[in-house]
UniProtKB/Swiss-Prot annotation:
Pfam families: GATase. Its EC number is 4.3.2.10, 3.5.1.2. IGPS catalyzes the conversion of PRFAR and glutamine to IGP, AICAR and glutamate. The HisH subunit catalyzes the hydrolysis of glutamine to glutamate and ammonia as part of the synthesis of IGP and AICAR. The resulting ammonia molecule is channeled to the active site of HisF. Keywords: Amino-acid biosynthesis, Cytoplasm, Glutamine amidotransferase, Histidine biosynthesis, Hydrolase, Lyase. This is Imidazole glycerol phosphate synthase subunit HisH. Residues 5-211 form the Glutamine amidotransferase type-1 domain. One of its GO terms (cellular component) is cytoplasm. The keyword Amino-acid biosynthesis applies. The keyword Cell division does not apply. NCBIfam families: IMP_synth_hisH.
Amino acid sequence: MTRKSVALLDYGSGNLHSAERALVRAGADVRVTADPDAALAVDGLVVPGVGAFAACMAGLRAVRGEKIIGQRLAGGRPVLGICVGMQILFERGVEFGVETEGCAEWPGVVERLDAPVLPHMGWNTVSAPADSVLFAGMDADTRFYFVHSYAAQRWELPPNEHFAAPKLTWAEHGVRFLAAVENGPLSATQFHPEKSGDAGAQLLRNWVDSL
């Protein structure tokens, strides 16, 4: 069987080597690239991200990443955001009182968690919908690895009778926040599947198999 082609978008942010290895193990033919044509040609695009929202957006814009993501989604081509790669899909992020515009694929704001201990670092369970594709075959007590202090804490996209409702997965650390979103061709996780052991490997296999 032909392996699905996946590009890891190289825009100066993200754990590219770990993500690349994890995606290869998940059955993908992986290339790391900042070339728009290569990123548009593959079956699936992964947008990683670590660090500050503003820095990630600056790096993304430098490689025309917003346009790449938008063009893929306009054609129904799958995109997966990871950690800050999920956060930048929202309208804006607020860090230390400074607001930065995101890709605006989803409405809403990424804000600091109101939690007694930050960053939220370590293993945590999530609450996924029964019909999730990403979490298919996993138990309710499955844990994933998080490292973050900011997250989207509300889902602000209004229902639309003409489109399937997004599948929302939640987690808690001081407050409830979005741990993952599955919205047509656009999916994202706040946790790091490439650092989440067998559970993360299963999630990536599920995504690759869906391409």
